[in-house]
Each structure stands twice: as structure tokens, then as C-alpha cells.
Amino acid sequence: MFLSLDIRDYNAAAITVLKNQGNVLPVKGLDKRISVVTLGTTSSKNAFTETCRLYTDVDVYAMTEANMTSTLGKLKGSSKVIVGIYDKGAAYENCLNKLVLTVGSENVIPVFFVKPYDIGGFSGPISLCNTAIVAYENHEYAQEYAAQVVFGGSDATGRMPVSVEGVSFCGDGIDLYASRLGYGMVEEVGLDSEFLQQVDSLANLGVQKGAFPGCQVLVARHNKIVVNKSYGYTDKTKANKIDGNTLYDLASVSKATGTLSGIMKAVDDGLISIDGKLGTYTKSLAGTEKGKFLIRDLLYHETGMPAALNVYEEMTDTASYTGALVSAKKSAAYKYSAGGAYINSTAKVRSDVTSPVKTKEFDYRIGKRLYVGRETYDTIMNIIHNIPLRDNRRYLYSCLNFCLLMEAEENVTKVRHDKYVYDNIFHRLGAYRTVYRPLDFYKKSEIAPTEYDGYFREEVVQGSVHDETAAFSGGIQGNAGLFSNANDLAKLCQMWLNRGMYGGEQILSSDVVNTFVTSKSPNSHRGLGYDKPNLAKPEWSSTCEEAGPTVFGHTGFTGTCFWVDPENDMIYIFLCNRVYPSRNNKAFTEVGARAGIMKALYQAVERNN
């Protein structure tokens, strides 16, 4: 283990930045197209290209003299082209030279995985480029750390060991410092191999006991991701292994990552005030009791709104059945399995606000024979607007509060919520696998399924949001709908830890982030949109009992969570699909992997202090 750490340290320390005119490095503008080109290898997949993919969405091309013209054509429109050079030779120099002349010297970032003297053969194109990085050897660790330097995940303090005519003098090198998450080993951040064994043990136990078919676990500390592991499969067929790219339905984690991101940005831009009234932003509620809610009240869940909509009642045609709609037991009269119960066998979905086939009005598929559209969303929101309030405004967690928050955000920004958070938050972080409606972007096989719904959906839900309110809203709603992986969520969490700064860019103002991540309700344990440890009643807390008062995060019904600990400079993320194939899953609670790994993390911190 420590020998491996020493080798990693050696490779990381050696990386040398020879040129950085205009402070191109670390690469910024992750919301623009970035391409990676390999020269001197026929493969477009190696440790360098795969590490680049961890930072953002990149197009990768293996370039040769034979395909040079076609490759150059494909690179048009790229804001930056990162070139990994793995061998010497006139052919590769020619390719690099043509690439620089075609794409532009300020847009090409050459990274050399060759011996120092071999760089001399590239003196021409190097002289034209604004940047140049030397990693010295074609080794897995050199490739990993070179990519981290390009994107600001690792410091670069290396110096040229020799002089190379036309390129550099001995001792040349420019210091570059980390500005994004890096990737390292647990020993680098005060954790240990015992913790890794505990993670493996709990995650594998969860898979073996049927608590979930698979999961992702991520731990970051001191700006380094040191655990980023995947376990099991997406479902019981075991056709698709979980990997770092697998997308999970975040369920209510969407509230604190998707909706809250939009609200924070709107607050930052002066479009919303947390002490403003909801009726100011949603005019149809002005003059009503709900219109008097402060945005702060909605974030704290102190509005008197009921916990959720009964979507089964609201979206079922009342004329289609007699007797009770739902039964706890299966029978001939109640044969449709849905929502952990059974639905009346004669019940039918409302045909006035849905369609069994795709139409112009109902164009978003949420089930085998179920399409929804704008009219469906408007119906859901109208029900929320008119739903009776409880007789007090004491804390009660409510999905409906966040539906109202997303609606307010869209009203003031005049932009659909998903586009607003993509453009202003996620894409700037390089979090391209954080999406609503994931089937618009990714293959079904890349998405973990959730529950079998025998009534509304008539299938195992996969690629459509599990939550019924969000599903009938068209897959984009304030309470749920976001899909992501652990690696992407870590970028968002680190941005919060950095008080809005990530990759050298201020994504959100430090004042706004500080307000949201430090505020706590005087009436409950909740934060402004975040969950927090319940210190008064630890047995009711969503965190392990070791989590301190500065911790903030959220959990999701599908088995997801993230927790950020500013005091220990630490991020913990656990994603799984524990509701597959049914939410009636006692094993998830019995195994307790989600909270158990968090507890093991705090024990490791204490053990190594």
C-alpha cells in the first residue's frame, strides 16, 4: 500500500508545467466543448483520457497521420484540445503541428509522456503553444496525475531535470496549484486501510443480503477523492455491473442538489430573497395563505403543508372503480402492485390529463402506456396550490414545499429549471452526468432501475423518476427527478465547501453559500434546504451519531445520501437503488450500510487523529 503511495507521490511530484501563457491552466470553461487527442498510441482509452473524463464531458480521438484530416474536422468547435503524446517521431510532431495550426495555439494543451530529451523533437509546435506539460513517462500514475494537473486536481511543482535544446533549460517549471477535486489514497488524508476494508465489508454485505443490487461509495477529504468505489449490479439479472458512470435516481437528494442549486443561484442574482413572500414570485398565490409563506419557511419545512400528494388518488379516474382504491393485501379485487400496496383492479388512470400513447400534448413517457405533458404538470401544481394546510406550521418535512420553490424559481428566471441549473451550476462544475430525464442523454443500461409499478407504469421504472409527483410533473420537479453519480455530486459538495469557488471560478457568491450551509432553523434540526444531524434526538437523525453540528446534507427514498462536514473538511456520498424491485425492503434497514459506512468514516478520522 505504502509502496504504491510512494510511486504515486513520485509521479505527482515530477509533473512539470513548462508553459502557461494567459493562465490557461488549470482548464476553465467546462461548460464549453473540450476534446482529448491521443498521439503515439492507437487506443483512445487509457488512464489519462479516463481521468480527464472524471472532470468533465470530453470527446476523445486517437489521431494518426492517416486519419489526421478527418480528426481535425471533428475537433472544430472545441474550446480546448488536450493532446496526450505517448511516443516520439516526426509523424507525431507533424500531427501536433497541424493540430496547433488548425485549432489555434491558445487552444491546444500538449502533455508529453516521453523522456525529457525526446521532447526536443516537438520544439516547433511547443514554441507555438501557450501551454506545455511534461509527465516524463508513459505510466498509469503519470497519466492520472497529468490529467489532474490539466484540470486543477493536483499541484504541479516539478522542474525539468535537464536542458532540452529549443524547449527548456534545466530547472525550468511553473508552479500550479489545485483548484478542483483531486484523486488520491486514503493515507494522504488521514484515513487508513482498515476503513477501506469496512467500506468493502458493508457494501458487499448489502449486495449479498439484498439490501440493494449495487451501490456507489465516495469519500473526499482535504480536496481529494480517496474512495470512489462501485459494488454489485444494476439489477438482479447481473447484466450490467455498477461502475463510476452508473446513474442513480437521487429521489429527495434532488431537493438539496437540484432545486436548492436553482434557488441559491436565483438568490445570488437578486431574483429571490429568502425572506421574501412566495406570493411575490408566484403571482397566482398572492393574497392566499400559501402566498404568505416566506422562502425561508419553505426551505425549513415550516409551512403547514402536508407531507406529500396522494398521487394514486389524484391521478386515478374516480368513476373507474368502486370501494377503496388501495389495499394492503393482494387479491382478485386488488391485483396491481404499486407504491408498496395494491390498487383496485378496475381502477384506471385519468385520461383527461394523460395519454396511453405519445401525442403533441402528452409527449413525455413515464410508463409502458403512460405519457404526460404540460397539462399534467399544471394539474399537479393546481392541486398543490389548493391543498388544505394543516392547523399549525410546526416543522413537517414536505415534498410540496420544494415543488413550490421550483415553481417560484422558474417564475423569476423565465427559464425551465433543468436548463437553469445545467447552465449556471452543473455544467460549470463539469457535472454532465447530473441530469433530469436521463434517457434524453444516456442509454437505459447506464441507469440503475428502481421499483416495479404494476399500476401507473406497468413495468420496472428505469430512466424515469421513481417519485410519482415528479413523474406526473414530467420528470422535472422540485421534490425529485435528478439523476447523478457519486463523482458528479462530489463536485457540487466541494464547491459548497469552497464557499462557491470551484476550478478557479466563483460559481456562487461566498456570502450566499455561507448563508445556506450554516443556517439552522430555531425550531428544528433542519438547515436552509439541507438536512442536518438531529443532535437533540440522535436516534431520529439521518446521520450517524458522530456527525457534528456543522454537517449538512440530505437523504433520498431510493437509498441515496450525501453529507458534507466543513469541520473535518470531508464529503461522504452513498448511492444505491434499494427500492428495486420493491420499496418493501427490510434488508436495507437491517444491513444499515448507508449510515454504517458514515460511522466507520468518523471512527477512522478519530483513529488517525
Predicted regions and their residues:
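Active-site SXXK
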Residues: Q197-N204, V217-L218, N223, T246-D275, ...
